[in-house]
Amino acid sequence: MLSFFTKNTLTKRKLIMLALAIVFTFFAFGLYFIPHDEISVFDFKLPALQYETTVTSLDNFLIGGSTTLYTATVNHEDLNEPKSHEIVMLLASDGNVGSFESNLLDDCFKNRIEYAKLQNYNFEFVNVSSLVVPPVWGKMPAILQTMRKYPSAKWIWWLDQDALIMNKNLSLQELFLSPAMLQKSLLREQPIINSFGEDNFRITPAAYSKEMIEQIQFLISQDHNGLNAGSFLVRNSRSIALLMDLLTDPSLADAGVVRHEQDLIGYFIQKHSQVASMVGILPQRFINAFHEGPPTMQWQEGDLALHFAGCWVENKCAELWTKYKDKII
C-alpha cells in the first residue's frame, strides 16, 4: 500500500511522521470520520468545538510576491452563502509563460478582474518565481499564503492561467458553492479515476447529507485521466492548510514518482480515507470545461470556465484563446 513512497528519498520514518501528522490533524480539530473503504461512504460527526482557522506563518522559502488585483467590498447584507466577499480567486505564476504569450497573460488578468468586480470576489496574484519548488508545485504554497492573507475568507478558487472565465454573470454560489447547490451538484456513486494505473478504489458517496456538505473542504473535477488541478476550490481551514503544507514537502516532488501535483492529490485521496472524506467531485464542466472532448467534458455556451489544458503542446494557446475570447458572455 505504501510502495508509492518507498523511494530512496523517503525514509520509513518520514512515512510514519506523515501519517501521524494527517491523523493528528483530523482528530485534533474535531473532524471525525468513520470510513467504509469498500465504497467510500462516510459517517460524519460534527466537530465538538470550533477552532481558530488562522494559518500560521510560512517558511520564508515558500513565500512569493503577493499582489491584490481586486479587493471585494465587504457586504454583511449579502444573502449568499458564502458571502461574495468571502471568496478569493487565485492565480500564481513564475513568469515563464512558455508558448502562452505574455499578452495572453495580460488578457487573463483582465478577464479575471472583470469577473471579480462583477461578482464582488477578491482576486489575488502570487509570483512564485522565487520559490524553491518546481512551478507546478507552487500552487500549494500560494494557496497557503493566500489563506493567511485572507483570514476571513471561506473559499479560495484556484484557476490556471490558461483558462478563460466564459460566463461572467454566473456566480460560484449560484452554480454550486452554496450549501444547497453543493448538495445537488456533487457526483454520486462515481469512481475517482486513478492516474496510477491501479484499479479505481474510491467511489463517491451515494448521497450527501447536510452534515457531510459542511465537512467538504476540497472541490475538484476529473477528466478521462483523473483529477485535474487546473481549477479547484479549497476551504480556508486548518485541515486544508495542513494538507497543502504536506503536499509542498520537497521530498514528495523530488521522489519523481508523480509528474504533477494533481497526481499526488489523487494518490492521497486514493490511499487516505480521511483526505478522501474532505473531497467533493464536481461535474467537469462546472469549473474546468475543455475545448474538446465528450459532452460531459467539452465547453458549451453558458458554462462558467474554459480551460485550454495542454494547449502549449501544439503551440495552440493563442489560437484557441482568440477563438473563444469572442464567445465570453
Swiss-Prot record:
Membrane-crossing residues? 15-35
Q: How does it sit in the membrane?
A: Single-pass type II membrane protein
Q: What are the EC numbers? A: 2.4.1.-
Species of origin: Schizosaccharomyces pombe (strain 972 / ATCC 24843)
GO MF term set: alpha-1,2-galactosyltransferase activity
For the keyword Mitochondrion, the answer is no
Gene3D superfamilies per the UniProt record, alphabetical: Spore Coat Polysaccharide Biosynthesis Protein SpsA, Chain A
Indicate the segments annotated as coiled coil, or none if absent.
none
Parts of the chain on the Cytoplasmic side = 1-14
The record lists glycosylation at 127, 169
Q: Which GO terms describe its cellular component?
A: endoplasmic reticulum; Golgi apparatus; Golgi membrane
Please tell me whether the keyword Transmembrane helix is annotated for this protein: yes
Could you say which enzyme class this protein belongs to?
Answer: transferase
Q: Which GO terms describe its biological process?
A: protein N-linked glycosylation; protein N-linked glycosylation via asparagine
Write out the annotated subcellular location. Golgi apparatus membrane
Q: What is this protein called?
A: Probable alpha-1,2-galactosyltransferase gmh1
By sequence similarity, the record places it as follows: Belongs to the glycosyltransferase 34 family.
Main location (coarse class): Golgi
Q: List UniProt keywords, sorted A-Z.
A: Glycoprotein, Glycosyltransferase, Golgi apparatus, Membrane, Signal-anchor, Transferase, Transmembrane, Transmembrane helix
UniProt topological domain (Lumenal) ranges = 36-329
